[in-house]
């Protein structure tokens, strides 16, 4: 039976994908006590294709970047479900970190990262409010 969070996702039209397997020498998540840390996610959509490809401030618009960040957050939720079995077990989203593929001079990474942050609040309510780091980089895998 789906929990409250999964019902909320379903009512929003969000289907969690099969969690991605690691592409190098790391694990998808680590649990230490009551803290769960999830490895970085790539912006694959439900169809298995990249939601956006290219640099923000170049070929990718802020709106498409936000969609990509949201896709990463959905993939993060899939990893959480794999780790916990039930998303209702999430007591709090503590921190999100986002690496934004950015052209030189692009400074709106925080606006892009809102695509992920907004989803956490949409799904978890006040428990989804979190600390955050957003870093612009010149290239990313994928």
Model-derived segments and spans:
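Short, polar/acidic, helix-capping and beta-turn segments at strand->helix junctions
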Residues: 1-142
